Structure formats: C-alpha cells, structure tokens
C-alpha cells in the first residue's frame, strides 16, 4: 500500500531579555499543554528543539517540564534537535563560537539522556561553509526550508527526500521542511493536513514529508490556544495522524537508520523566502514586494518563484547600523576573550539573534531585547584591562576611538562628526547610547497608518549619538527639529574631525556655516563618574545663530514628551537609574522622545527608543561651553 513517512517537529524559543510575563504566558498557553497532550498519545513522535535562553528559564522556573521531557525522551516519543545554544545566527559568529554554541546544546541534550545528532538552523540562515562547522561539532543532519532546495534548482516533486550536501570535502545530510505543511498546521482543519499527506503517499518507502516549525504556533500566537486546545485541534491531530495507515510517523534519526539520502545537492546562501524580502534595504524591499505581487496577479509566481531571490540575512547589518555596531562589538569581545571561559559565556549569550534584525515584528526595534545583549557585552568587556584603543571597530573604513577606565567605555567616531556612539557603564551594565534611529520601513504604507500616528511620524537623516553639533537659525522651533524638518546650517554633523589623544581626547574641524569659515573644537575627558567636554567655536564672521549640542540617551522605561525650557542642567531618571547633564552656561534645552514605528500583533506601535536633549546657545563670533555627563547610582 502506498504510504508517506511523516516527521513532525517543533522549535521553542524565547529571545534573550524577553519579559518574564511573556515567557510565562507562552509556557502556560503553548509549551506545557503541548507536552502534556503529547504524553496522552504514546504512539505520537515529535522532534523537539528548545533554545538555551528558554532552557535556562525552564530549569530555574519549571523543572517539572524538564522532568516530563526527559520521560518522553526515555519512552522514545521525543527526539532532541540542537542548535547554537543561545540561538545565534551561526554564519554571523566566528567559527570557534559556532562549535562552542553547538557543543553547549549537545551537552544539555546529553544531560537529558539523548545523544543529539541533528541541528535546527536558527532562522534557517544557511551558507555552504557551515558544513565544516556542523561536522566538527558532531552534527549529522540539519533541517532547512524547501525554499533552499528550490533555489538550488530542485523541483517540488524532488523535495520529499533528504539529500547530502558537501563543502570542502565534508558532507552532511539536509532535510527540507515542507512549506505547505507550515501553512496548514495548525491553522486549517486536521482533515486538510491528512488529505495533503495522503496525496503524497507513494510506493517508494523512503519518501518523507517534514513539518518543523515554531512551537509557539501551538497556543502562544493570537487565537491559537483556543483553536489548538479548547477546540481540540491538537488532540484530534495527534489521534488521527498516529493511527492513520497511510502515514508512517518517524523521527529524523529513525529515518536515517532505515534509508539513505536521495543524492547530492549544493545549496546556495539562503533563508526562508520572507527573509529575502525583509533583509533588503527598505526601498528595494518595497520593490521586491511589488514584484511578487505583480507575478501573482499574472499567475506566474508559483512557476517562476525559484528564480525570485532577494537579500541575505547579513544585509541586516548594512540596513541597521546600530545592529552592525552591536555585532562588531560582539566580534571584538569574542576575539579578545577567547581564553577566558567565565567572560565567554556573556559573549555567547550576546550572540542571541533576535536583537540584530527586524522582519515585521519586534527584533532590533525592541529596546528590552537590545538591552539584554548590551548587558552581556558590557559584562564580558569588564573582564578586559581598561585601555584606550584606536581601530576600525565596525568595519566601515573609519577609525573609532575607544576611551576606557574602570567604570566606563566611551567610543567616538571622528569620521561621524566627532560624536560619541557608545557610552557604556561597567557599574550598571548599560549602554546609554543604545538608541535606534527612526527609519522608513517598506511596510510604512501611509494609507494603513492611523491618522494620529502620521502626524508624529518622522525619519532621521543620521544615526543618533552624543555631542552631535548643530548650527540653527535663532527662529528655529522644536516642532520642526523633532520632525527632521529643520534646516541644518553647518556641515559638521556627518563630517570628519581631526583628533589627538593624550590624557584627553581633542577633536577639531574647520568647516562652513552658511558659507562662513568656522572652527569647532571639543575636548573630552573620561572620569570616574562620567565625562566632561569643553567646546570652543570660532567664526571668522558674526553668525547670529544658535549652536546646539545634541545628546541622545536610551531612556526607554519612562514615557517622555516634547518640551522646551531654560536651564543649566537636566536630570534623567529611567530603569538604568539617574544621570545628570550639567552646563556651565544657561542654555535653551529642547527635549523630545525618539519613537520608531513598527508593527505588532495588535497593529501599529510607536516604540520609544530614547530621548534627544539638545543644549542651545547663541553664537556670534566665539563661544566656549563646558558640559558634564554624570552617572548617579
């Protein structure tokens, strides 16, 4: 009788730094009831991957889940599939770290009583060089999307077998996940999944259909708990799939012990199809979306889809400079702390992928997720002896200056207006400059955005830092400034400054303001409670303008509103504690929240990424300013 082998798998993950209540809700709505339901069906088999962040939470908070999982492994109902333990994008971290991450995951599986041989590839981000890594880490098979195989030229009919892939003389088995099953399960009636699997039944005993997708689909996603548990979808699915004569339930390891892969394929750099849209720069992503829409209107998409390719995951590091900077700080620390096992665990945690990219929801736009990465990066950095360094940290071709003492790490980009782009506290493990700029995203279609939000919507022309130098008309207003509708009269913001490092950092530049020659010099001194900066601005002619020093801070837990006032200081209170910025001279101060617009499960959301504070001083021919940034415990 024709039959189809069927492998069913779930991937459970929570981002580093996610809110406790979200993890608890996912546990109660998805992880716990799924495993308890599985226990009721002894003939049902599931391949399970759990990321390290979630593993650590479960071990601390829900040991009974771990015990139940161990029991199901012992009964042969569950096969553990591993990954990089803290869920990194493997191709985005050094080779040594890849192996270490996978071996950490394999070590946990061994503790659970299982010798794991298979790998769930995070976000299915594949590059051929991974073959060597995976083999070195003791991995025999890896699970990818069928899109990877179609991108290599395989037809849909050829996607129901695993294959070998080779690189540099090493080979590994690759299983394709069936896309149609991902859309059927659990959203469509069980009968539709059964009918589809029956349609695949074949006399070839080695034919296999693979479903492996997010475990959160089974209860944590909106509306799924009611569908999957209250309306009995999962029980019906387990009951019918495990008793169907035409369907042979298997685990990956069982399949490989019985059948050989179909042959040899060479897979290109790829992830799942949607990722190729999201990773493109916003304007190209919009064109890509329109192109797909046009193909669908012409009924050509399915026929020619294998030739439609967008961007690759690493494009996100180009698309979001803040993510790239965080990524390069991680690479720096990975290299410098290679032989420090205590510090390395913080580096490995900071490699958790979620904070480095953005699809439709969350990702880099979630401050609490970035904050957790920075916390671990700064903890790791604290194991290094403080020293000043000059090097191209973020691989943009310009040298960064890293000033450091026992309490702080301060990074200046002379080629980006001589501004500060990292101010990290070793006492509080916080980067005060963890601020993502406001950017246009390809899904920002104005017809969809609520009217009230449109009025606040604005996009930044440059990344946000500290000590960013503005020349403005005295009649300029805060409303224009915060909506990026003002006129910048100088050429200092994004231009290169000269620098000299002694016991202090001196930065200077000769530029133009309304065609007039102007020199700006700023001198930075790092001290035990923050830093001081002294400005000296000299113009060859009278300017009659305002000089503004902009300081952006990662104020993310206190809701702020635009304000204008006169003062010599501001005190900022947030989840990181208190900081104070003092000016020797009274200044007009502009304050406004930096809010990015992104989508969530509930619709559109503004997310406060930080707050901009600009100290404004009148300038004619000469101006001297002294500012202090002070951290309070």
From Swiss-Prot:
Keywords, in A-Z order: Carbohydrate metabolism, Glycosidase, Hydrolase
Biological-process GO terms, alphabetical: carbohydrate metabolic process
EC numbers for this chain: 3.2.1.1
Catalytic activity: Endohydrolysis of (1->4)-alpha-D-glucosidic linkages in polysaccharides containing three or more (1->4)-alpha-linked D-glucose units
Any one GO MF annotation of this record: alpha-amylase activity
Entry annotated with the keyword Hydrolase: yes
Superkingdom of the organism of origin: Archaea
Keyword Hydrolase: yes
Active site (record annotation): 123, 214
Stated family: Belongs to the glycosyl hydrolase 57 family.
Protein name: Alpha-amylase
